[in-house]
């Protein structure tokens, strides 16, 4: 998940949106369309907290949007990062040195979509776990620095 308030991304100057690119909206998801590693093909990132900032998908990405409003913001990033989704992607990724997918391949994949209430609970729980992991990693890094200083 990319929180535009916390994560530093390159900026688009007003009026300079690249041609053939659509601006991302809150909850849009971006997939990597190629990688040297099958674990990284279709790696997903969901955008949230855009707060009016202009964001476009970069090269070698597939831009996804929930046009039918079946998901809550925050759920898709976790759903498309699941092992069950990536097992499906590994079967359909093409290539020998560089593995790739295209938007047509996604029609062969399935992701479970529970009720919106359940999605929100799942997303909130996983976000709290991510925050806890980040906090623990920071503590570990600080302790390593302290150990080296002693």
Regions found by a protein language model. Give the residues of each.
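Short, solvent-exposed loop/turn positions at domain surfaces
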Residues: 15-18, 95, 127
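Amphipathic alpha-helical segments
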Residues: 76, 107-149
